[in-house]
Design a protein with these regions (language model features):
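Short, gly/Ser/Thr-rich active-site loops of penicillin-recognizing serine hydrolases
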Residues: 290, 294, 309-313, 317-318, ...
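Short, conserved catalytic-motif segment at the N-terminal edge
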Residues: 25-77, 99-101, 115-122, 169, ...
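Cleavable N-terminal signal peptides
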Residues: 9-10, 20
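Short, Gly/Ser/Thr-enriched beta-strand-loop segments that form substrate-interacting elements
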Residues: 61, 312-346, 356
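Short, surface-exposed loop or secondary-structure junction motifs
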Residues: 117-330
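Short, well-ordered beta-strand elements
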Residues: 56, 342, 349-362
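Active-site SXXK
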Residues: 29-32, 46, 52, 78-106, ...
Length: 382
């Protein structure tokens, strides 16, 4: 997860650039390798799928530069905020079952939110609170229009060391930054609230619901909040520009507690706690390409699928966002804090999955994703 500004920049980068290639190469690897050679990209796994099959899967560069460990198709990544669309999909399963409605007030399911206030005035000397015009709703926490802040003080600097129920109680006593429904404010807190609603409404823990209702049926065998010992060895190292801005420096993600397999001190975060592979994420995207169903099983109704992937934010707001999906004219998708992304183009019948572990890039490394997506569209989108 990351700051509002950086996540908006990441979502904006999901748009496809103009065609680059006179003759479309058969493989994307040759186009991506120069970024690796120039130390602008550590490594990546790039996947293209249609409704039924994988059209391309390629790995380039390194999962561990110092250890000379090559990136592989089954390398694992912290997908961070790409967890959000999966959480929203789970909420819509419960909507389909009539257990919750998008326009329910959050306080209907989480009574601790009764009496939540909004900031009316604030300066260095005082803060004035008042009652909001209406309680925040499930829809508003999913489309970032609730007025909730990005996170609470309990999540700094590490996001995953507080149980979900306790974390959400901290949000309930946190004043709203703006009136519900009036301002787009990217809020991981809001998505964590939705995850807690899943628990209360379903009678299952959030992670159990996700595993039983989404990950296991889709065959997402490497999607987890707790990579086991073997999986942890497959998690790619994280990189950012070094002090000179011309090379890559390895770093450890501070938002996560370690070891990653610790189920006693690490807790699942609905807004950004998942680890996954490109291939697992591709399964999720194929379900979306098929309008909420895959391999003979329906996960969400057609109506719920449309709610997830249509613009929910009002025309008065510049940010085009659905229920945990960034929404463009002919695409929807989401990115993650470490520059991962998934993008679905229903009219083309294609989805692209881009897996890296980067907090920024030296040189032109940030363009590698666009090069891959342009290649994918020109190679398979006709």
């Amino acid at each position: 997860m990351k700051s509002t500004c950086s996540i908006l920049a990441l979502l904006a980068a999901l748009a496809w650039p103009a065609p680059l290639f006179a003759a479309v190469p058969v493989s994307s690897a040759a186009l991506l390798q120069p970024f690796v050679d120039k130390h602008e990209l550590a490594g990546a796994v790039a996947v293209v799928v249609d409704k039924d099959k994988v059209r391309s899967i390629e790995a380039v560069g390194f999962a561990d530069i110092a250890g000379r460990k090559a990136m592989k198709a089954d390398s694992m990544f912290w997908i961070a905020s790409q967890t959000k669309p999966m959480t929203a999909t789970a909420v819509m399963m419960l909507v389909d079952e009539g257990k919750v409605a998008l326009d329910d007030a959050v306080e209907k399911h989480l009574p601790e939110f009764r009496g939540q206030m909004v900031v009316a005035e604030k300066d260095d000397a005082h803060t004035l609170l008042r009652k909001p015009t209406h309680p925040i709703t499930i829809r508003e926490v999913l489309d970032h229009m609730s007025g909730m802040p990005f996170m609470s003080a309990l999540e700094l600097p590490t996001h995953d060391i507080v149980p979900l129920a306790a974390l959400v109680r901290s949000y309930a006593i946190t004043p709203l930054v703006s009136e519900p429904g009036t301002r787009y404010l990217y809020s991981s807190a809001g998505i964590n609230i939705a995850g807690r609603v899943i628990e209360v409404v379903s009678g299952m823990s959030y992670e159990e619901f996700m595993q039983q209702r989404l990950f296991s049926p889709l065959g997402m065998k490497d999607t987890t909040f707790w990579p086991n010992e073997k999986q942890a060895k497959r998690v790619a190292k994280s990189y950012r520009p070094d002090a000179t801005k011309t090379n890559l420096a390895e770093f450890q993600i501070t938002q996560l507690a370690y070891p990653l397999s610790d189920r006693t001190r690490r807790f699942p975060i609905p807004a950004g706690g998942l680890f996954s592979t490109a291939q697992d994420t591709a399964r999720f995207c194929q379900m979306l390409l098929n309008g909420g169903q895959w391999n003979g099983r329906r996960y969400v109704s057609e109506a719920s699928f449309k709610e997830l992937t249509k613009r929910q934010t009002p025309a008065s707001v510049k940010d085009s966002y659905g229920l945990c999906f960034a929404v463009g004219p002919d695409w929807f998708g989401h990115g993650g804090a470490q520059a991962t992304s998934m993008e679905v183009r229903p009219a083309k019948g294609l989805a692209t999955i881009w897996m890296v572990q980067h907090a920024g890039f030296p040189g032109e490394g940030g363009n590698a994703q666009g090069v891959f997506k342009t290649w994918a569209l020109e190679r398979f989108g006709k």
